[in-house]
Structures are given as structure tokens and as C-alpha cells.
Amino acid sequence: HHYFLLRAHSGFATDGSLLGIMILNKFVGADADFNQPRATFKECVDSINADLDRAEALLPNDYGNITTADQIPAKYRSIVTNPDLYNIAMGNKARQLVNGLIAKSFRSRLFLLAASPAFQDASNTYTWANAADAAAKVLDYVNGPAGLSSTGVTFYTNDTEIGNIKEGSNPAEIIWRENLATSNSDQESSNYP
């Protein structure tokens, strides 16, 4: 949420300094002093980037079922060794939850925002090179630009491909999307009075 707040509310103050938003990294009670100064734009970008680093360290790069224990990512092997248990939390049913690739894509958007001429200032050291490097890490997931479909930008016109999307799987060009649903009344059916 800090990214969207930063995008909507950052800008130059009357003294010419480039300001971001208040950085709140802990619970704030109703009786707290909300009259706090805004952080600089760069401090906000750095804070969001640190949050994304922590997310990437904890999350899998992608979710999906596995069949053997050696497919469990190394960072989770001290927690779980049974593939069936891993699949409950990190398998196909977890697709469309935030994952490491989504964190990488948000970093790419963040650095693109930070490099924008709208936010250029001596205090903001982020450049187009930072944005390009972050975007390259996202493209590495599909083995670079060559891994993208040559007709990917028109996937939405391919009814067969759309009809075959299930269990949260995505075409190569889509990182995160709403699950395809043929009925939106599941909640109502399950919770009928």
C-alpha cells in the first residue's frame, strides 16, 4: 500500500524538497500523535524496497505442486520435508497469492516511478538504469525477452487459451491476475442463511 500512497501523494513541498509519505512500520493506536513529518521521497522508496527484499526472502518465487522432497526450495526444507504438506501451503491452490516474482515486479514499478521525471531531484538518486535492472530480473523468470510469446499482447483474443487457464496458472506475460470464475455466487451458496 505504501507504493500506491507514494504514487498518489508524493511531490514537492513549498520549500522545494521532494517529499513522500509518512512511513508507518508499526501498529499505530487511535491515541497516537499523527502530526508527524513526511519522509523524503527517497526514504520512502528505500523503505518500500526493503519491504520487498524481506518479502522475496520469505516467499517462493512461484507457487505450484511438487512431487518429490528434493523439489522443495532450500529455504523451506528445515520447515517441511513432505511434498504433500508443502503442496497444501505452496501448491497450485496458492497460485495468485503474492509471491517472489510479484515482489520483483512491484520493485520494477517502484523504480520506474522513482526514475520518472516527475520525481527527479538531487535527493532522489534512482535512475532509469535501476528501473531497467529491476525489470530485467522479472524477465529472467521467463529466460529474458525471448521467453515471451510473440503474440502475448493479444492473448485476450484467444478464447482457447483463456478457456484453458485454471488453477491460477498464467500465460507467460501475466504475473498476477484475478482467478477466472464462471460463477460469482460461491460465497452466497456456501453461506446461505
Regions found by a protein language model. Give the residues of each.
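Structured, solvent-exposed acidic/aromatic patches
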Residues: Y3-P193
